[in-house]
Design a protein with these regions (language model features):
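Conserved ATP-binding/catalytic core of the eukaryotic-like protein kinase fold
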Residues: 1-180
């Protein structure tokens, strides 16, 4: 069933953005505030699974604990007509994966991008959050060259350096090494 044209609370779904392990992401219009947002919808089959709903809510809380210019912001955790969804900052631009496919990124630009990614991860780590799925597809580069790290769906809160991390349930375990 297509979500395009449907309204969830005050958000009118405009277009698909992408699909991941924990849901679909759409561009939407916040009809109260008049701004474009991203809506991450928990699939109907997951909404019946208490563990998946809890994980979705945990993602929202972890993301809400982060406030950094290089991390995509969350505006809310909502439910409308039995549909659970996150309201997120809409980040325009290509993913880093898209930019890499176009060809080599000049060294000077690569250093600027890497610095911004490191700052985002440092801010998350200072709040006790490890992304666990950092990869070029989860990093947006705005037209102005600003990095936004997205998709904290597999993020884990940790108590400190002594805690052992269990990455065995990560669907993109091969990307985990970049975060260690």
């Amino acid at each position: 069933m297509s979500m395009i044209g449907k309204t969830l609370a005050q958000y009118k779904i405009i277009a698909p953005i992408g699909r991941g392990g924990m849901g679909e992401v759409f561009k939407a219009k916040d009809q109260k505030l008049g701004r474009d947002v991203a809506i991450k919808v928990l699939p109907e089959e997951f909404a019946r699974d208490a563990d998946r709903v809890a994980r979705f809510q945990r993602e929202a809380k972890l993301l809400a604990s982060l406030n950094h210019p290089n991390i995509g912001a969350i505006y809310g955790l909502e439910e409308s007509g039995g549909t659970n969804f996150l309201v997120l900052e809409l980040v325009e631009g290509d993913t880093l994966a898209d930019q890499i496919k176009k060809g080599p990124i000049p060294v000077e630009e690569s250093l600027k991008l890497a610095h911004q990614i490191a700052e985002a991860l440092e801010a998350a780590h200072e709040k006790g959050v490890i992304h666990r799925d950092l990869k070029p597809a989860n990093i947006k580069v705005t037209p102005e060259g600003k990095i936004k790290v997205l998709d904290f769906g597999l993020a884990k809160a940790y108590a400190g350096e002594q805690e052992q991390l269990n990455l065995s349930n990560s669907p993109t375990l091969s990307d985990a090494a970049t975060q260690q």
